[in-house]
Amino acid sequence: MNFESIEEYKRHKLQKHQEMVQKQTVPYEQKVKMSEQRIREFIHECKRRGLNCHVSVGGLDSIVLATLIERLGYDVPRVSASSLEDKTIQVVHREMGCIVVRPLKSKVNILQEEGFPVLSKKIANKIDTLANPTEKNKTVRHAIITGECGEQGHFATNSKMQLPMTYLKLFGGLDAEGAALGYKKPNFKVSHRCCFYLKERPCDLWAKEHNSVPFLGLMASEGGQRADALEENGCNYFGKSTARSCPFAFYYHSDVVHLAVDLGVHIPEIYGEVRVSENGEYYTTGEQRTGCSMCGFGIQMEKRPHRFDRLYERSPKEWDFWMTKCCKHEDGTPFGWGEVLDYIGIPWRDPEHWWLNSEIRDQLSIFDYLTSDGTLIETEGV
């Protein structure tokens, strides 16, 4: 879609956002009915187009979605890059009979060769662009450093293309223009492509082989690029080269947990117990969001005990590997997430401190994982 001005584009985005907010505010029972209708419509349209469909299964959101689709009487394959998930999630995947696809690269190889997934996909993408200059991305790099856009961006200034100053000071030196302005650069790579190699591409290859398009358990309330795409394209989308269904697009995490209870879903142990807050919000006492143990998207938004502290509680050996020795510098010196977190100012040492008092864990709730506008912290790419 082409826009004649930045103002027209902003009006369009605001309208799409307001439409999503309106759907998010409807009662839970109505949301479930809307989801069921989206599922039926997507399957009907797939049949009309000669397409198969499947559920891309990962964490709780997609586990609940797969169960809902089954309860509606549809026999839809469940496909998962299950090896990336927590062991307790893998148990549920096996119970569900998921078809397992293998990652194209190992987690270690991705961190070493591509870079660390940190802050957010959008920010990591910009940092990666600065680190890999070409004549083609020259204008984009200038916008990331200065906020000044070229003709395609209607020559806007102070645009959202610019890295936040906090991270511009730390990563802007990867680009010659940023280095000239005195910005620093890290001694490690940053990348947004981890999900591509670990699950997106493997699942896409399976889908192509089986002429199938996915159901995804994505929600706009997760924020970031997911919210942008869902607000723009809605629940069911059939494009020139892409088709997908996100029946939970207008859900909040509480709605998913509520539906999990109503459907009697086997909730993986990593999520803890289900509880209901005083205002009727459903949440789990353990992890609110799950994914790869090496993922750092959204870490800057978390309070301690953050995800790496909780990893220490579950597996001190795995924590030690990812934090101190999963990668090597050019001189052979081992390093890991600890060095990355030090660089961006995130505390991570002495994780055992947070588990000396078991009451700390019991006090955690979904509200420790919300941003100021009430949306869940963006952590996956998935």
Annotate each predicted stretch with a short phrase:
Residues 2-21, 51, 241, 253-382:
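ATP/NTP-dependent adenylation/nucleotidyl-transfer catalytic domains that generate, transfer
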Residues 2-256, 260, 380-382:
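ATP-dependent adenylation/nucleotidyltransferase module used to activate substrates
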